[in-house]
Amino acid sequence: LDFKSLCDIDTKDHVAVSAFVKKSMDEMLKKGLITDDMYRLTRPKLIEQFISSDVAARMAQADKRGDLYKEKPFVMDYEGVLVQGIIDVFWLENDKIVLLDYKTDRVNAAKELIDRYSTQLKLYADALGRIFSTDGKCIQADERLIYSFRLQQTIVTSREYKK
């Protein structure tokens, strides 16, 4: 999705959001970014709910500033183990990194996702801290979030992680 474009619509206007999602999906299909099957299986209402969220608004503002980064691969050594992954999305906000991971898991409670993914997000945060270090000082990814499409909510994991 083109998050910059979200700044141009009223994300509380359900008709405008629905039209934005439809247009975005049509463009992705036309460009070959998604297949016909993916297009048919996508549940636009879940995407619309996300677009109307506060976290999507924050992402739109970051994208407008040029501070939004999507699908960034990384490789790092973590305690003698080579770790690689792809970070869904992160952005810079108030000289800090905000890290967000999208999840579609079938869960009934946020705690399930926190238990399942907080370590993964901590590793991603550590990788970003190394990437964005300047003069020996790391910019920290203090805010680590999961957006659950199933629960339709943003979940904070950063306070839950215990090393």
Predicted ranges, named:
Residues 1, 70, 89, 124, ...:
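A residue-level signal for conserved active-site and pocket-lining positions in enzyme catalytic cores
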Residues 14-16, 20, 133-162:
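Substrate-binding beta-hairpin/strand module that engages nucleic acids
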Residues 1-77:
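A non-catalytic, helix-rich entry segment at domain boundaries
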Residues 28, 128-131, 135:
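Solvent-exposed amphipathic alpha-helical surface segments
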Residues 13, 32, 80, 95, ...:
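Intrinsic-disorder/low-complexity loop/linker signature
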Residues 76-131:
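Non-catalytic protein-protein interaction segments used by genome-maintenance enzymes to assemble
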Residues 71, 100-103, 147-149:
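Generic beta-strand/beta-sheet core signal
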Residues 66, 85, 95, 137-140:
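Residue-level signal for beta-strand positions within conserved beta-sheet cores that form or flank
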